Regions:
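Carbohydrate-interacting regions of secretory-pathway proteins
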Residues: 20-203
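Bacterial Sec-dependent N-terminal signal peptides
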Residues: 1-24
């Protein structure tokens, strides 16, 4: 009986420690008030309204990025996005930015039939993996969508509204270092909203 009690206490202690550790390493990337903790790249519009982070095409109609000040290696990123107008955007990870040139990997966020949830390598190999076309039905254009991105060593998995979109293991990704960044595509006429950006550090 005593041994069972000790075992039970051990299991409870491990669970509480795990929960505490996860709480300690999770944080909000967007404070809902301003762009503190982020860097704007390019001339496209990034602003906060009603607690939402909004990107919108500017007069130059070029690529634009909003990158974290910090680098993140292994993590789970949860966020919500809502596409208005064209809504062509993306979420970059382990990326570096020079002006409006970004090197790294993008989780696609795009209108229907454009591979949302897939992985694209910028200024490199291009598309590494696209979701099965049947999964495009999980995207709710014009509504709030939940995107989850897990990056751990050389493995990346994405989920859209609770549905796994892709999983890929890639040695080059595994060696990557850099920021998380949100993208607005070039061409003009684009608007997207973001909220509830939460990151759990897995290092």
């Amino acid at each position: 009986m005593r041994s069972k009690l000790i075992l039970l206490l051990f299991v409870v202690a491990v669970f509480l420690n795990s929960s505490f550790s996860q709480e300690q390493t999770s944080k909000e990337l967007f404070n809902g008030i301003n762009l503190d903790g982020w860097i704007v790249y390019g001339t496209e519009k990034w602003y906060v309204s009603d607690g939402e982070l909004i990107c919108e095409s500017g007069a130059d109609k070029q690529y634009g990025y909003l990158g974290t000040e910090e680098y993140y290696k292994n993590f789970v990123l949860n966020l919500e996005f809502k596409q208005e107008d064209n809504g062509n955007s993306g979420v970059f990870f382990r990326s570096t930015i020079d002006g409006t040139k970004i090197s790294g990997w993008q989780v696609e966020v795009a209108p229907p039939n454009n591979h949302t949830g897939g992985i694209y390598e910028s200024y490199g190999r291009g598309w590494l993996i696209k979701p099965n076309p049947n999964k495009d039905k999980y995207l709710k254009m014009g509504e709030w969508n939940k995107l989850t991105v897990k990056v751990y060593n050389d493995k990346v998995t994405t989920w859209l509204n609770g549905h796994e979109m892709i999983t890929i293991e890639d040695q080059i990704i595994g060696k990557g270092e850099g920021r998380i960044a949100l993208q607005i595509h070039d061409g003009g006429g684009i608007k997207a909203k973001w909220r509830n950006l939460t990151l759990t550090d897995l290092n």
